[in-house]
């Protein structure tokens, strides 16, 4: 039996080999399709996660903007409170300084008139009158030490008159020295 043009020795392959190749190709195509399905599912999941992440980022940005605005308001609020406290503190200190100055000035004015309340250290001495910066004929000004002594004597008379406590005495003494 001789093989014809459609026989196995001709240009064509037997149907078993063709079907085997077709099955292999179909298996490869099925495998590629399965891989593509998995990849598409992963891309869809990734897109969903990116969308959620974008929503979270927008919410976080809105929260950050709100926080920044409220922090700015709070900063301004406490800055004004601090300014008010500084003004109040300055006013209180100013009032205290004015009271002390008025008290010292009035106590110096009234201290010379009270002759019965002199301390033993100043009882035998008479207060020296303070002239207008000129003493005697030399044209020299009165020494700061004698002014300090006179102020100290006035301070002592005032303390005796009002009965100051020692710590107030120290404060007033330091204040009087600073005035010189």
Curated annotation (Swiss-Prot):
Keywords: Coiled coil, Cytoplasmic vesicle, Membrane, Synapse, Synaptosome, Transmembrane, Transmembrane helix. It is a single-pass type IV membrane protein. Residues 1-10 have a biased composition (Gly residues). Residues 105-180 are vesicular. It is found in: Cytoplasmic vesicle, Secretory vesicle, Synaptic vesicle membrane; Synapse, Synaptosome. The lineage of its organism: Eukaryota, Metazoa, Spiralia, Lophotrochozoa, Mollusca. The chain crosses the membrane at residues 85-104. This is Synaptobrevin. Disulfide bonds: none annotated. (Microbial infection) Targeted and hydrolyzed by C.botulinum neurotoxin type D (BoNT/D, botD) which hydrolyzes the 49-Lys-|-Ile-50 bond and probably inhibits neurotransmitter release. (Microbial infection) Targeted and hydrolyzed by C.botulinum neurotoxin type F (BoNT/F, botF) which hydrolyzes the 48-Gln-|-Lys-49 bond and probably inhibits neurotransmitter release. InterPro entries: Synaptobrevin-like, Synaptobrevin/VAMP, V_SNARE_CC. Intrinsic membrane protein of small synaptic vesicles. Pfam families: Synaptobrevin (PF00957). Residues 21-81 form the v-SNARE coiled-coil homology domain. The record marks 48-50, 66-67 as: (Microbial infection) Cleavage. GO terms for biological process: vesicle-mediated transport. Belongs to the synaptobrevin family. Residues 1-26, 110-150 are annotated as: Disordered. GO terms for cellular component: neuron projection; synaptic vesicle membrane.
């Amino acid at each position: 039996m001789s093989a014809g043009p459609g026989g196995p020795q001709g240009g064509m392959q037997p149907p078993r080999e063709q079907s085997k190749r077709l099955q292999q190709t179909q298996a490869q195509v099925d495998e590629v399709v399965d891989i593509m399905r998995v990849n598409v599912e992963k891309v869809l999941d990734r897109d969903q996660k990116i969308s959620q992440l974008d929503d979270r980022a927008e919410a976080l940005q809105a929260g950050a903007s709100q926080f920044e605005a409220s922090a700015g308001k709070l900063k301004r609020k406490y800055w004004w409170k601090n300014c008010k406290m500084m003004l109040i503190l300055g006013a209180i200190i100013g009032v205290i300084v004015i009271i002390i100055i008025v008290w010292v000035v009035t106590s110096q004015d009234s201290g010379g008139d009270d002759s019965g309340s002199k301390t033993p250290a100043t009882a035998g001495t008479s207060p020296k009158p303070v002239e207008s910066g000129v003493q005697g004929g030399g044209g020299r000004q009165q020494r700061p030490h004698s002014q300090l002594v006179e102020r100290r004597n006035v301070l002592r008379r005032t303390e005796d008159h009002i009965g100051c406590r020692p710590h107030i005495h120290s404060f007033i003494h330091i204040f009087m020295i600073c005035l010189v």
